[in-house]
Amino acid sequence: MLIPLLALAALALVPTGASAQNPWLERRVLNIAHQGGESEFPSNTLYAFKRSVRAGADMLELDVGVTRDGEVVVMHDTTVSRTTNGRGTVASHTLKRLRKLDAAYWFAPGRADPYRHGLKRAAYRLRGVATGKRRPPRGFTRADFRVPTLRTVLRAFPRTPITIEIKARTRQEETAEYVRNATVLAKALRDVRRRDIIVASFRQQAVDRFHELVPQIALAPGIGGAASWLLAGGSPGAGVAAFQLPITYESGGQRIPVTTAENVVRAHREGFAWHTWLSDDGESVATWRQLIDQCVDGVMTSRPVAFERTLRAHSAPAACG
């Protein structure tokens, strides 16, 4: 099985004009801390980002929403109730109100579902740090456990690559909401000179809108662009530097393979990097090793500390380049 896989990977080493200009193809395999590593640390907090980078993460993945007063903040869900002690949507809160919330309130480390509500109080070991009811771990502050602004994260990690996913504003997740948030994000990043940022969204319209306003920042395609490339051999869209896709997509009750050796080879040949996220497929050492052997350029993992151990023990095949 590995021999044909390596043969396919060797084809990806043929240089093209596009690949020569894509810095995201220059390093493999990136340990990308999804939400900062939400299975090991409280989702999308400065504490999570700092811990994952110290453990060896090469890149941070985070999600952004927009507050009622127009501030870009880092939060995975459109609502705050799953991870914090608050209620309502991100869009219904002002930044001042959002900053009072405890972003580690429902984090119970060491569990299959680390954000399960209703456990014994002792399970939520970091609850109260943000509000001053518990002393922060050594080397950290109360602010590391609150909802951060995107500006704060960029300032805290000036040399760590970051991928930013645009979220919606309500539970209905209308396309217009994504486009609006893309517009606000573009304004926030318009004068940023960094070239180690990738912007993504499930909605292609949001990605396209962001590119219209800030064409110098790299993109990952939405579902529309990815489907065009995967199913019809078309373009994934302007400004795309990397695919950020799962191992499989579920459609009609069936799992359709997406991250395959053939697709990774094709992406590399056409000058695109390939980052795989694992939320719907589960994470294991066996899965991580499979992805490394397929020559993916990055793995978006909820367990960056554990994944780093696998990376150190299992290198990408020489044919990956």
Task: Describe each region flagged by the PLM.
Residues 17-321:
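Phosphate-group recognition and catalysis centered on beta-loop-alpha active-site segments
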